[in-house]
Amino acid sequence: MKTNNPVVQLITISADEAGQRIDNFLLAKLKGVPKSMIYRIVRKGEVRVNKGRIKPEYKLADGDVVRVPPVRVAEREEVQVSAKLDKVAALADCILFEDDYLLVLNKPSGTAVHGGSGLSFGVIEGLRALRPEARFLELVHRLDRDTSGVLLVAKKRSALRSLHEQLRLKSMQKDYLALVRGQWQSHCKAIQAPLLKNIMQSGERVVKVSSEGKPSETRFKIEERFEHATLVKASPVTGRTHQIRVHALHAGHPIAFDDRYGYREFDQQLQGTGLHRLFLHAAALRFEHPNTGETMRIEAPLDNQLRHCLLALRKNATVK
């Protein structure tokens, strides 16, 4: 066993940390400690706020003094972290923008945004290892594991609140590039179809169009046509799970190499292009800076595999 923090810590809550639940605060502070252990030390009174016992749902206030006891975690977890150091180092090359308030990353395909569900490494865990001095690092939004591109991370709670408000007001614009099956029809500029999320017996999440689902809208624009495929820009108005992927399928144009909603025959037509990952890339994000109010537009370049795929398709003659 290894001690996560070897002595009792007394932490004074700052204005930026105020407003969050004590359990969430401890999960962020005691990295690698299971949730069950967090709730156990709170329930047993080992964690105290202003010298008094509290419940897991207690919301911290500015100036609160939190007593955090020594917590022991398995050394096996430490070994797993060290084994991922190469991935952590690679994340440093993916940073597109960073200041005191936020960090913007070009997330690689195949990397989850969060560890869990059998995954020991995610982007947020990697960033916390890369920036151990950062007191606060939280995802503003999510990207599917196989989707690459712009991912926004808040470095202050005030920044997270501001950016979440922009998401709620739909003032943040996200633009994706997707390679879809067949010839996308020019008149199809938006898909409005309610989406319902189902959990299969295997635990896999599957989303489908259903009248019982939540209202969902994605806008589409043709970027380039090829013999068997179309490169489209997809801009989600709402932010449902797998929204672009399911809306593209609903339009009759599933995304290339989508192992959940795609067509294998289409994937086979792309043999020779070097593509073997989902062709969905968060290409650009426009938002207001949470501190300055400046309008920012961050773009993420395509990775080599996506870029080479498009070059191969162009060589096979672009459809005019």
From Swiss-Prot:
InterPro entries: PsdUridine_synth_cat_dom_sf, PsdUridine_synth_RluA-like_CS, PsdUridine_synth_RluC/D, PsdUridine_synth_RsuA/RluA, RluA_PseudoU_synthase, S4_RNA-bd, S4_RNA-bd_sf. It comes from the Bacteria. The active site is at D144. It catalyses: uridine(955/2504/2580) in 23S rRNA = pseudouridine(955/2504/2580) in 23S rRNA. Its EC number is 5.4.99.24. Signal peptide: none annotated. It is an enzyme of class 5 (isomerase). Gene3D superfamilies: Pseudouridine synthase, RNA-binding S4 domain. Coiled coil: none annotated. Residues 20-83 form the S4 RNA-binding domain. GO terms for molecular function: 23S rRNA pseudouridine(955/2504/2580) synthase activity; pseudouridine synthase activity; RNA binding. Keywords: Isomerase, RNA-binding, rRNA processing. One of its GO terms (biological process) is enzyme-directed rRNA pseudouridine synthesis. Responsible for synthesis of pseudouridine from uracil at positions 955, 2504 and 2580 in 23S ribosomal RNA. Belongs to the pseudouridine synthase RluA family. This is Ribosomal large subunit pseudouridine synthase C. The gene is rluC.
